[in-house]
Amino acid sequence: MQDPLIQFNRDPATAGISVAPDADGFYDMGDVYKAVPATDKIAFVIRHSKRQKNLGKESELTPIGVQMAQTLGSKLVSDESFYYASTDFVRTRETCNNIAIGRGETDAEVVTWDGINGGYFLTVPSDTLDALVSSKGGNQKYIAQYAYDEIVAAPSFKDQLVSYFQDFYPRGNQFVNEVILANMSSWKRVSILVSHDMLVEPLIVFVSNRTIDLKIYQADYRWANYLSGIAVISNDAGCVTVLPVRGDSVGWMINSQEVDESVQ
């Protein structure tokens, strides 16, 4: 299934991939990996696993986050080795390492890559966006409203806010073409690229053509879950398929319901 705004196939059956989404529209990463023909290349771009409350670069995975990543790895077990890349954050690198451990890879290398930094959909540094919206609901609210083209704000504030974001559909197509497909030939058949919610939230909305509910600004206040993201699948016939995927049991989370491991 294609849409004029999206340059890629969104129906796995068209590419000979027998896999079904869950009730929320997400495809399980393990199911996708098993269903994709062995001649196809796959790149998974996902959010890191559950991390400590600190948002700085040194924030580590929590015990639950370590287990989540290793459980995901156990669903991706095979004889082939994967390519792993992360941003320059401890939590993204640890996510790669623990997925590899779950797969049984003991010597996996994790490449640090700026190409998957969280600010891809922004025209300004993320700190600039934070400064503008910190007292008006925070960046998650406005990143989601941007992705769904539902920004609600006073005209002058809205004009400034809109200028901080790239054009949504062209930028999504550009990411798949220039960040993923342009580099696939130098990666292994399967790649795990671990980034942040600021990148993954818009990507999921993009590849689902705004059909998945991650509207944190309205009830049920859903946001991209840890280990959720997209799969980009390329076959020998030149068909490129993009799918929203999840590495955990559900693709979304509600921030207020997140388990606080610091009080356990």
Q: Language-model features: where?
A:
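Low-complexity, Gly/Ser/Thr/Pro-rich intrinsically disordered linker/tail segments
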Residues: C239-Q264
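Flexible, surface-exposed loop/gating regions in the mature catalytic domains
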Residues: K53, T112, G119-A182, S186-K188, ...
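Hydrophobic, Leu/Ile/Phe/Ala-enriched alpha-helical segments that form helix-helix packing faces
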Residues: Y33, L72-L76, C96-R103, L129-K136, ...
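Short, well-ordered beta-to-alpha junction loops that form the rim of enzyme active sites
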Residues: H48, T87-F89, R189-M198, V245
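Active-site-adjacent alpha-helix immediately C-terminal to a catalytic or transition-state-stabilizing loop
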Residues: Q166-C239
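Active-site-proximal alpha-helix that buttresses catalytic centers in soluble enzyme cores
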Residues: D3-F121, Y146, A154, K158-F168, ...
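Surface-exposed beta-strand edges and their flanking turn/coil or helix-capping segments
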Residues: E58-S59, F206, I254-V259
